[in-house]
């Protein structure tokens, strides 16, 4: 290929920063929408900030800072949440001799899971590490098997928020504690380098 053709190919394949999503070619998540009938899921959340926006740049810098020097306690939190956010709640409940409502939680999550994936695929937000290099920002991602879907909203935080709501109905005295645990879950995903803070905020709104 001649030099002029190479240059032309680069120009032809140039993608606007704001058009970069998690998937190069957006796909629709296949879901039985009858399970969420009556809810206009497209109106649950606003669009995430554009990749070129000052807010996104600010969030990327925040994620970058948090991923540079993680403490052992932070690494442990990341590992626990990455495996199962409910472990945070199990320990809290065990110390107080309280039970986790497993059947109720999973029955509700079977519905919430549809929302989560439909929203993720609909917005197709790129993960922070996909956009950071375009702003000359370094994010040290701790790679696992739990961040291979679009970023917005955070599935882990949807999960932990549901747990907080479910447990608050049973044990209202500990409501603040339950939602604080969900905050820790969201922090863990930022510390891991796989989510924007606004991904977590969106999960709280959608749950």
Each model region followed by its residue ranges:
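Hydrophobic alpha-helical bundle signature of multipass membrane enzymes
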Residues: 2-192
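Interfacial helix-loop-helix junctions of multi-pass membrane proteins
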Residues: 184-207
